[in-house]
Amino acid sequence: MRNACLAFLLICLASLVSALEIEDHRFFPGTGERVLHVISTADLDVFEPYLEAFQSSQPTLSIDYTVVSSTELYSAIRNGAAFDLALSSAMDLQFQLANDGFATSHRSEATAALPDWARWRDLIFAFTAEPAVVVLSTERFQGLDLPTTRQELVTILRDHPERFEGAVGTYDVRDSGLGYLFATQEARATDAYWRLSEVMGRLNPQLYCCSGQMIDDVADGRLALAYNVLGSYAADRLARDSGGRVQILGMQDFTNVILRTAIIPSSARETAGAGALIDMLVRLGQREAPGNWPLPPLGYTGTDSRVDFGPIRLGPALMVYLDPLNRRAFLTEWENALEQR
């Protein structure tokens, strides 16, 4: 009977996989018949320690973990895909799902202990606070002063076009939900965003969907710098880079900080397992320091007191740039700045 159920599960999974652009996938077998289906934007090498820790306390529960882009995740949940838990760094898209009725409420002692700014109506829960950073190639910047503000970065790029031609990476915000969130929030916070975008646009910038690939391309020498990537991913890559090829910079004028969030989709079946994983994540999220975990907890912004951190608030204001007219206007301005060739 169990084999028949597993066979049916695999058939259903195969049809689901064919409908999604999956970046990675892994099945963590438990000793029982229950399966927790997780859809997430977090790379496996970053999130695997959390899944292993959770499964050690829930050994009978199997975990089916699927990695997709934030926009794929949003579409999957909105279309009723059979996932029990959705974890995303694109907090605006997560909030939109919760606001539009695609999330199920969850209440526990762990979620009740979260500050008000880290949860909304028992539907969406933040468990990390992750800054956007600049990752640069130490070789490509040899002989140059390292920028500490966007204006200094503008000056360096403008004064050395031959060094940075085709070697600047950033998000393609048309496809990346996280990239769009970073861009819109930064544009609201500082006029320097558009000045920097225009200078990048003259240098034939390379556009990406994800932080991980940008960081790898800096480490491999294909890029001189990657702009607005997740600091947690950059720190993980830096820890594995023994050659000193990569350096992380936080802009001192302003640094966006996103909250990675969790929701239980309204289509979820394994709500008990989903709630238990949320509880573990939010408990870890209330630590004072990262410790041995890859992702930084809520409220932790590192040790550099010179950096002006600007946390993006969890609330209805997140949906302003998701309005179709606002989105189209922003993307038009972004394309004019970044695609000048």
PLM feature segments, named:
Residues 19-96:
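Early extracytoplasmic/lumenal segment of secretory-pathway proteins
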Residues 41, 48, 77, 90-94, ...:
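Extracytoplasmic ligand-binding site segments that recognize negatively charged/polar headgroups
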Residues 50, 192, 196, 269-281, ...:
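Short amphipathic alpha-helical coupling segments at ligand-binding clamshell hinges
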Residues 92-97, 219, 223-244:
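A ligand-binding cleft/hinge motif common to bilobed small-molecule-binding domains
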Residues 103-112, 123-126, 239-256, 265-267:
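Short beta-strand->loop
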Residues 133-140, 183-184, 258-270, 289-292:
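A bilobed periplasmic-binding-protein/Venus flytrap-type ligand-binding module shared by bacterial periplasmic
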Residues 161-163, 280-303:
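Periplasmic-binding protein-like
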Residues 305-341:
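Extracellular/periplasmic bilobal clamshell ligand-binding domains
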